[in-house]
């Protein structure tokens, strides 16, 4: 038994320094709270044990949202990327996504340096084995060396280290990601505290030596020449010119045959793996089985940095035995002679069932305890970082006895992510997709600052200087819109010829420039050229104006739906409501309400298995005063009449049966 001793006191303690933990700790420190960030290994701060990239569909928007709120991930990747690309440029603005290839070592070093130089923030290497909980309130942590750190709030971001187990074929051993020390006792402690945990699984592909790849047999995927950034504070002049390409190749029938012949040795199919894996990031053996009609699968060869020869074999995740992995790799065009530097592996780990959380990411059964990241059942660095930021903000607010901060589904993809977790839970590693957002035309990559910077400034995460620039941008957008409304695009041969060149019908009369801009494929630059007028604002301002005008009708429809959502969100459900008292609820709805404890009628509406009739009954019960009547009887120890008891399921007065309300 290790003897404990009282160490330092903090306002907030963050356990785990992955992408969630870094954002949580930085947010807390920037909000003026004395913060301790504890990690199993200092060499794993903001480490990328899987794909060396940031962004992509939905995920890239999350990174922009983190930056708009005052988080660090966007700045960190802008300082350490080796390639930047905008995806889905041929599609509408709702699904465009920025993706950066990271130098994973520089990313880690830059984030660690940021943390080490942030006031109010202490970084320490230790393994947390136990929480200090008194009267249902978390008051600190105890490490494996016996140090007891006291705090007003605690954030857990254990990632895949929580009782982690690595699996490579028949080989299994206790480990965190990338062969790091796992966290065992903390999971056991959480179970003793009453938390429901479950096992998830994720995996990573082999890494090969870039010097042994025959790139002539692959297709080059270069970065964008047009400057792109995740952070709104990054400048075009700093955009990286000397980018490193990724490369694309494919599996083939030979690859698939090797996999099929060895499925009996695949842990996924042999029964060794018990945890549930990610549906949207399956292993290559899973893809070969599930999509047997496909004769090839895409593979991306992604450099892991400027100073390493390691290349990540993307979309080739596997837990096959090492000897089989070698055969699989060598069957792929361009990789016939590739040297494998690290084998792929699967890792099983513990997650907290996320329905045990509030939207602030505070746990429901222990106050001042927050969880974030893969620990909550998500997959991906970006989802983790977004949760970490919200958990860190709320831990800091909780430490000051201030009300919590939440984002709605209409505010941000981060809000969609957290609401899905808290309201629906998840039976598999959760990945954020654009299709999960009902209001994705409003939750765009380009307007995250317009949606969230106000919040970041109010929370103290956005400086006054940055906020002033944000206000200037908003004014520039207004000025550009006004100028477009003032300018007239007159009938002319140049205008008609231009319309013909883009496949548009000719004009019959002159129109205002903002009306002309509504036509497909018309840009503000075209209006400036055709009219000789200058529209104020930089390219980011003009992008906002173009999207706002072109999609005005669709945006208005989404805003109407959001207004209805807000009305439902305003209808709060009392925290101590007893669903057994509500007559007429379906059994499934009653059980779901009791398990999830929705905070508003809007959240109740989103719970799977709940039908409109159940919602109507719940709404009437709350709004017609029946809830308050029930609470009155409880408070005054009154017994209702037998009629009232029969109708609303209360205990009647046995002596008189008289009405007492």
Curated annotation (Swiss-Prot):
Residues 206-230 are annotated as: Disordered. One of its GO terms (cellular component) is cytosol. FAD binds at residues 16-21, 128, 183, 374. GO terms for molecular function: flavin adenine dinucleotide binding. PROSITE patterns: GIDA_1, GIDA_2. Its cofactor is FAD. The keyword DNA damage does not apply. It is found in: Cytoplasm. NAD(+) binds at residues 277-291. It holds the Pfam family GIDA. Disulfide bonds: none annotated. Keywords: Cytoplasm, FAD, Flavoprotein, NAD, tRNA processing. GO terms for biological process: tRNA methylation; tRNA wobble uridine modification. Residues 216-230 have a biased composition (Basic and acidic residues). Its main location: cytoplasm. NAD-binding protein involved in the addition of a carboxymethylaminomethyl (cmnm) group at the wobble position (U34) of certain tRNAs, forming tRNA-cmnm(5)s(2)U34. Belongs to the MnmG family. Homodimer. Heterotetramer of two MnmE and two MnmG subunits. This is tRNA uridine 5-carboxymethylaminomethyl modification enzyme MnmG. It comes from Lactobacillus helveticus (strain DPC 4571).
């Amino acid at each position: 038994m290790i003897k404990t001793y009282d160490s330092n006191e903090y306002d907030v303690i963050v356990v785990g320094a992955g992408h969630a933990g870094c954002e949580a700790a930085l947010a807390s420190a920037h909000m003026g709270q004395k913060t301790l960030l504890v990690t199993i290994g200092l060499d794993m701060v903001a480490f990328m044990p899987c794909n060396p990239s940031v962004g992509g569909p939905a995920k890239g928007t999350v990174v922009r949202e983190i930056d708009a709120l005052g988080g660090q991930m966007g700045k960190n990747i802008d300082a350490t990327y080796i390639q930047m690309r905008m995806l889905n440029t041929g599609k509408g603005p709702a699904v465009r996504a920025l993706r950066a290839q990271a130098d994973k070592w520089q990313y880690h070093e830059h984030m660690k340096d940021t943390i080490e130089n942030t006031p109010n923030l202490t970084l320490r290497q230790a393994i947390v084995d136990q929480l200090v909980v008194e009267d249902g309130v978390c008051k600190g942590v105890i490490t494996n060396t016996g140090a007891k750190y006291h705090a007003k709030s605690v954030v857990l971001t254990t990632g895949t280290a929580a009782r982690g187990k690595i699996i490579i074929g028949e080989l299994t051993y206790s480990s965190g990601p990338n062969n790091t020390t796992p966290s065992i006792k903390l999971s056991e402690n959480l179970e003793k505290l009453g938390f429901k945990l479950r096992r998830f699984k994720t995996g990573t592909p082999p890494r090969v030596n870039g010097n042994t790849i025959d790139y002539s047999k692959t297709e080059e995927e270069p970065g964008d020449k047009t400057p792109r950034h995740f952070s709104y504070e990054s400048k075009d002049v700093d955009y990286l010119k000397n980018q490193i390409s990724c490369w694309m190749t494919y599996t083939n029938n030979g690859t698939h045959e090797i996999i099929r012949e060895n499925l009996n040795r695949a842990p996924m199919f042999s029964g060794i793996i018990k945890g549930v894996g990610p549906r949207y990031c399956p292993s290559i053996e899973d893809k070969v089985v599930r999509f047997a009609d496909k004769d090839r699968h895409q593979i991306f060869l992604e450099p892991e940095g400027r100073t390493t020869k390691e290349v990540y074999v993307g979309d080739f995740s596997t837990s096959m035995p090492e000897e089989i992995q070698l055969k699989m790799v060598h069957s792929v065009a361009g990789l016939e002679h590739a040297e494998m530097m690290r084998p792929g592996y699967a890792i099983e780990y513990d997650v907290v069932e996320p329905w045990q959380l509030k939207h602030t990411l505070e746990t429901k059964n222990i106050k001042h305890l927050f969880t974030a990241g893969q620990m909550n059942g998500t997959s991906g660095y970006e989802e983790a970082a977004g949760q970490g930021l919200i958990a860190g903000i709320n831990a800091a607010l909780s430490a000051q006895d201030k009300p919590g901060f939440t984002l709605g589904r209409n505010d941000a993809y981060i809000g969609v992510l957290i609401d899905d977790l808290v309201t629906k839970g998840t039976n598999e590693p959760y990945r954020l997709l654009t299709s999960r957002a009902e209001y994705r035309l409003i939750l765009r990559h380009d307007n995250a600052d317009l949606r969230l910077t106000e919040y970041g400034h109010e929370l103290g995460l956005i400086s006054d200087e940055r906020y002033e620039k944000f206000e200037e941008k908003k004014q520039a957008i207004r000025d550009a819109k006004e100028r477009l409304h003032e300018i007239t695009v007159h009938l002319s041969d140049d205008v008609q010829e231009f319309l013909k060149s883009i496949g548009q019908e000719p004009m019959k009369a002159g129109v205002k420039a903002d009306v002309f801009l509504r036509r497909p494929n018309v840009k503000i630059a075209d209006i400036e050229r055709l009219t000789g007028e200058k529209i104020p604002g930089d390219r980011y301002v003009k992008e906002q104006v173009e999207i706002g005008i072109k999609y005005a009708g669709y945006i208005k429809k989404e805003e109407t739906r959001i207004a209805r959502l807000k009305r439902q969100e305003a209808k709060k459900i009392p925290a101590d409501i007893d669903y057994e008292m509500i007559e007429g609820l379906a059994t499934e709805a009653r059980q779901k309400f009791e398990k999830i404890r929705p905070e508003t009628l809007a959240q109740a509406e989103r719970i799977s298995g709940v039908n409109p009739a159940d919602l109507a009954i719940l709404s009437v019960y709350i709004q017609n005063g029946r809830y308050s009547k029930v609470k009155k009887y409880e408070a005054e120890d009154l017994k209702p009449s037998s009629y009232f008891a029969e109708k609303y399921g209360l205990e009647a007065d046995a002596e008189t049966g008289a009405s007492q309300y």
